[in-house]
Amino acid sequence: VDWTDAERAAIKALWGKIDVGEIGPQALSRLLIVYPWTQRHFKGFGNISTNAAILGNAKVAEHGKTVMGGLDRAVQNMDNIKNVYKQLSIKHSEKIHVDPDNFRLLGEIITMCVGAKFGPSAFTPEIHEAWQKFLAVVVSALGRQYH
């Protein structure tokens, strides 16, 4: 992927403003609520039977932060995202059997949470476009090891 200087700057500046402890839990909770079939991958997280249970589930919140930590690795390694996610892609493909489209869904929800948090003055169309490109590369890398 070729990144322009403006895209790199936009992604890094936006990332620097994101509170992973807020956006991560929000996004993963919303994924589990809006797309309930994704819950099957989180059976070990305890009670996720209702929206309130999901929103109050500490394991969901913690895993949301973990997901955002994975995005941090991508932000820090924008020229090597495929390799950054190679082992994680294998794990999600061969061990957890996650539908790779779920990565796209989560990326869309993360984008909605970020957009709602910062609004149009900070999440401008240019920043949004760079962010979408970044997440598309991440989603592609996560799906790369699927057969």
From Swiss-Prot:
Residue ranges constituting the Globin domain according to the UniProt record: 2-147
Domain of life, per lineage: Eukaryota
Listed GO CC annotations: blood microparticle; haptoglobin-hemoglobin complex; hemoglobin complex
Keyword terms of this UniProt record: Heme, Iron, Metal-binding, Oxygen transport, Transport
Binding, heme b: H63, H92
GO biological process, one term: hydrogen peroxide catabolic process
Record GO terms (molecular function): haptoglobin binding; heme binding; metal ion binding; organic acid binding; oxygen binding; oxygen carrier activity; peroxidase activity
The UniProt record lists the keyword Repressor: no
Tissue: Red blood cells.
UniProt key word Transport: yes
Subunit structure: Heterotetramer of two alpha chains and two beta chains.
UniProt function note: Involved in oxygen transport from gills to the various peripheral tissues.
Family indicated by similarity: Belongs to the globin family.
Protein name (database record): Hemoglobin subunit beta
Annotated source species: Leiostomus xanthurus
Gene behind this protein: hbb
